[in-house]
């Protein structure tokens, strides 16, 4: 996404897969989704954000499949004329992806044991 002419702000959030350290057996996460359901939910979240803040453009990217520890997993970018709108929208969408988006992750362990939970 490029910063559209006339906008003053591009707020971004880049999230990596956290290395939990103490549990050295976890080597990656496998992230799953149902494409239609997830895309619909993300479009709805962007629509909600657009009614709250005046933004010009939004880019959401969330990786699917195997993602190794410390690799980027999510990118949220928001272009707006004012930084408050850009930062607030970026925070709202980041929180949505973490807490409400229909994504599931499974721990990938070196010992082949895995646990499935909401992303």
Give the label of every model feature segment.
Residues 1-73, 79-119:
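N-terminal, polar/charged subdomain of small-to-medium soluble alpha/beta proteins
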